[in-house]
């Protein structure tokens, strides 16, 4: 059966999360009088944030805890004394300011323009519902997509199969009509394959631990070879 629907993850796949996140911290930390070299901060923060997002996907922490604890643990690890009030303020400002930085991965516009002529495009994201649409609108990619599905709207998070079952029902598609593009092997690729949906792993960092049965690309424009 011919592919009719292309699902994309948003953060780390189209929207350059790490670059935009770094720019946001460069803005909000000095404004809160937190004096630290941004590279030193990010070196500690990024793996802590990654671990908390994994816990969040696994329903082990709440959204509120994620927003606070990833900053609290980073400051503690760096031995920087920051008041709880300031941490809560920073966590809210981060969410507010993040969508205003809009770097996309190379080839995003070109590949979306190419695919839109042939397929119906959709987003499936675990990102916070209140900012995902803002990110897409401010970066100029919102109008490429017919459907935006957030895990918060479903009530569970990727890699829960219910997210993909909901997505198929939402767009009135069969699994064999669809393909998923994303950066996270567990949350995007393996679960899609387990649902009978084809999948392509976006691997811009050239990670080498990719299972042999998974198709992987390093640049979004490489999708033209498959779609």
Model-derived segments and spans:
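Asp-based, Mg2+/Mn2+-dependent phosphohydrolase catalytic module
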Residues: 1-6, 19, 85, 113, ...
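N-terminal helical cap/lid subdomain that shapes the substrate entry/recognition surface
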Residues: 2-10, 14-105
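Generic recognition of short, well-ordered alpha-helical interface segments
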Residues: 66-70, 103, 110, 162, ...
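Catalytic-core regions built around general acid/base machinery
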Residues: 107-118
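Glycine-centered short loops/turns at secondary-structure junctions
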Residues: 118-119, 196
